[in-house]
């Protein structure tokens, strides 16, 4: 593909690996699709029993992200209790398998006991009634398990929440063979792509040049300077979803859900025991992780200092000139799969 080189200005901002996969609209879209697909089923009956009056899968889809801070509003007692009982809850949202891999295997480099595949497997077991210290080490309640499944099924379909990029000082992608290889000397963890910085404004220009319809003007906060760059992870979390919505001429998650369901998408459904489905989803997402990193170019390492005085490293990133088109197409398809797979999982648990 023809490439357009970006000269990227470095941002001093630091974003954690546990960034909000798909962003609020993406997660709500996954939940909205599932809400519509399970309507009138036994699964819907059980979902309603676990949710509070007026709640829906769309409405609770962002709950596991909202517990990370106050950006959704004040923390509820339920959120505080969950956070206190799950000190590693931010690690539940992703796994860091090298994107060059084809499969997720327990114990491989980048996997962890508290990663997204293990969390989904545990939450599924809880809804199946398999609540033992071995199957439910975090003591998730049935309501928590449902909410986590709703959210994590979205997360696991986000390419950068499964396939991780490891990089050398000069910006070469490398594949660590074991956890100890990632030593921040020869091999660096890009933190889910958060330490790769892309030029936000230039990518938007590329989107418009590739006939992606213009979006709504972004509100600016008085006195707050606009960041010139954004993490590559944030691009995949939010920008690709925004482009996907714009390409379908939809503005809300519900509109997106209605539009894609009406198109009767061909979605490959999972087979086998539902406890294996998170593994199948991770393997499938690795296909798109490879595509996310295809034809991008990473510059040399640049040291940065966080507000806490900690040193971390960033790399500038160049993307192909048409990158907004394939990346937003991937986002659309992954959101659709997330919604359909969530509905199928709930119906498999509650036939």
Named regions from a protein language model:
Residues 20-152, 159-351:
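N-terminal, motif-rich segments that launch catalysis or mediate targeting to/interaction with membranes
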């Amino acid at each position: 593909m023809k490439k357009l080189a970006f000269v990227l200005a470095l941002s001093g901002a630091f974003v954690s690996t546990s960034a909000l996969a798909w962003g609020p609209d993406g997660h709500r879209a996954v939940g909205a699709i599932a809400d519509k697909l399970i309507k009138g089923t036994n699964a819907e009956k059980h979902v309603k029993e676990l949710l509070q009056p007026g709640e829906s899968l769309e409405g609770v889809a962002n709950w596991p992200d909202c517990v990370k801070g106050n950006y959704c509003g004040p923390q509820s007692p339920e959120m505080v209790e969950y956070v206190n009982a799950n000190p590693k809850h931010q690690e539940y949202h992703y796994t860091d398998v090298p994107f060059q891999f084809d499969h997720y295997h327990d114990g491989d480099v980048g996997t962890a006991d508290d990663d997204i595949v293990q969390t989904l497997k545990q939450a599924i077991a809880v809804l199946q009634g398999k609540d033992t210290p071995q199957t439910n080490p975090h003591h998730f309640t049935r309501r928590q398990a449902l909410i986590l499944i709703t959210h994590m099924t979205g997360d696991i379909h986000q390419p950068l929440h499964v396939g991780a990029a490891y990089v050398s000082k000069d910006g070469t992608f490398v594949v660590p063979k074991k956890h100890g290889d990632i030593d921040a000397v020869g091999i660096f963890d890009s933190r889910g792509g958060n330490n790769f910085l892309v030029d936000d404004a230039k990518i938007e220009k590329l989107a418009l040049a590739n006939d992606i319809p213009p979006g709504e003007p972004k509100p600016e906060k008085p006195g707050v300077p606009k960041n010139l760059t954004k993490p590559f992870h944030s691009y995949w979390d939010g920008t690709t979803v925004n482009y996907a919505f714009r390409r379908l001429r939809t503005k809300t998650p519900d509109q997106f859900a209605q539009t894609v369901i009406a198109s009767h998408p061909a979605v490959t459904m999972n087979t086998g025991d539902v406890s294996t489905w998170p593994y199948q989803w991770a393997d499938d997402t690795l296909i798109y992780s490879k595509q996310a990193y295809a034809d991008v170019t990473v510059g040399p390492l640049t040291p940065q200092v966080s507000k806490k005085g900690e040193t971390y490293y960033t790399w500038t990133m160049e993307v192909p000139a048409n990158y907004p088109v394939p990346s937003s197409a991937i986002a659309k398809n992954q959101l659709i799969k997330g919604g359909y797979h969530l509905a199928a999982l709930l119906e498999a648990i509650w036939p």
